Swiss-Prot record:
Top-level taxon: Bacteria
List of catalytic residues: 46
GO cellular component, one term: cytoplasm
GO molecular function terms listed in the Swiss-Prot or TrEMBL record: acetate CoA-transferase activity; butyrate-acetoacetate CoA-transferase activity
Organism name: Escherichia coli (strain K12)
Coiled coil: none
Descriptive protein name: Acetate CoA-transferase subunit beta
Family annotation (Gene3D superfamilies): Glutaconate Coenzyme A-transferase (3.40.1080.10)
Catalytic activity: an acyl-CoA + acetate = a carboxylate + acetyl-CoA; acetoacetate + acetyl-CoA = acetoacetyl-CoA + acetate; butanoate + acetyl-CoA = butanoyl-CoA + acetate; acetoacetate + butanoyl-CoA = acetoacetyl-CoA + butanoate
Length: 216
């Protein structure tokens, strides 16, 4: 199991039966593959779906917000973008799982643009992180060049300020509580010294710090 799969598997443990969930593009879409037995969620997509189905149900005439072919489950609803964003902005999404370029110790998120690169816009990320009841960021702990992505202060353009509730990487789980960043779990095979060495942000260590089970 590679790093992204481990991250997706751990995030899936946070979702509750009956949740309405928005999964962002890329790594977050993998979360649906690791839902625990007995946990059923309803997937929402910004382009107007409630009740997305697994990849195996993909239809050539349907695409999700990332432009990928998708399917829908029995009872699904389809609507325009105005209704979709009313659901998001109205606080009706229980959890969103998004990727990240940078997260900092103040729960700020940068995940939509790398300076100097042309992008068509932020998409629905800003709405999701401000409107969802729980914001989970799923990303690899360091950049491809080994540099830190978990910083004292984000250096890339922000998506939202003080919006992240939980950050999951292949090395650790952090939670943002009462204005502080807390390390609550370390991955199986990792140790506190490694997490500190690869994390620029300052964080507190939970008294009941857990080590993730390898079989989760």
């Amino acid at each position: 199991m590679d790093a992204k799969q481990r991250i997706a598997r751990r995030v899936a443990q946070e979702l509750r039966d009956g949740d309405i969930v928005n999964l962002g593009i890329g790594l977050p879409t993998m979360v649906a593959n690791y839902l625990p037995e007995g946990i059923h969620i309803t997937l929402q997509s910004e382009n107007g779906f409630l009740g997305l189905g697994p990849v195996t149900t993909a239809h050539p005439d349907l695409v999700n917000a990332g432009g990928q072919p998708c399917g829908v489950l029995p009872g699904a609803a389809m609507f325009d973008s105005a209704m979709s964003f009313a659901l998001i902005r109205g606080g009706h999404i229980d959890a969103c799982v998004l990727g990240g370029l940078q997260v900092d110790e103040e729960a700020n998120l940068a995940n939509w643009v790398v300076p100097g690169k042309m992008v068509p816009g932020m998409g629905g990320a800003m709405d999701l992180v401000t409107g969802s009841r729980k914001v989970i960021i799923a990303m690899e702990h360091c950049a491809k060049d080994g540099s830190a992505k978990i910083l004292r202060r984000c250096t890339m353009p922000l998506t939202a300020q003080h919006a992240v509730h939980m950050l999951v990487t292949e090395l650790a789980v952090f939670r943002f509580i009462d204005g502080k960043m807390w390390l609550t779990e370390i991955a199986d095979g990792c140790d506190l010294a490694t997490v500190r060495a690869k994390t620029e942000a300052r964080f507190e260590v939970a008294a009941d710090l857990n080590t993730q089970r390898g079989d989760l």
